Amino acid sequence: MVTIHSIEEMLNYYISLGGLRKDAVNGFRYVFPRQHSKVRFWGDLHGFSAADADFTYPKDTIIRSQFSQRYVGIGLSEQGTVEAYTQRDQTIHFGEGVNCFVFDSPVPFFMKVPGGQRLRFQGLYFQEQFFAENNIPLYDSFWRDAKNTIHGADLHAPELVSIYRRIEQCRLTGLAFDTWLKGFGLEAA
């Protein structure tokens, strides 16, 4: 089992799997030559970010995540499945399509991924800090309500797919890209 408490630990985990960090326009990526895999990031991983992954775990893996900051993740999955749970008797299966995950407390969250399975997905991630930095007021029960309504749901959200595609294809760089991406985060939130 792998335990991850922060974004930095997640990035170090990629390195432990043989990932080589490379700079990319408006972000960075990890390439995994042995697995012919990659994970690409845009934006502020502690605020609003986007990711593109084409990754094959070399062996069966259980990841125990216990982040201190709450977040919403929206995955646009093209291939592969992941089993997720906070309690084994309440599992969620994330598969092809638009999936949503709400991490609303410091309770450990587990993801079980079969080895040798190719995972291809894009993601949009909204950390709690993003809402605070942009003065987006969240009512007291926002995180609990979000978890009760969209957590684990297969969503029909073509506008989110469109936002991801536009991020991926954007030709802006530097501060112009950062400002543009923040605007897209605000639009999506």
Descriptions of predicted regions:
Residues 2, 41, 151-155:
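A general boundary/transition motif marking the beginning of the first structured unit of a protein
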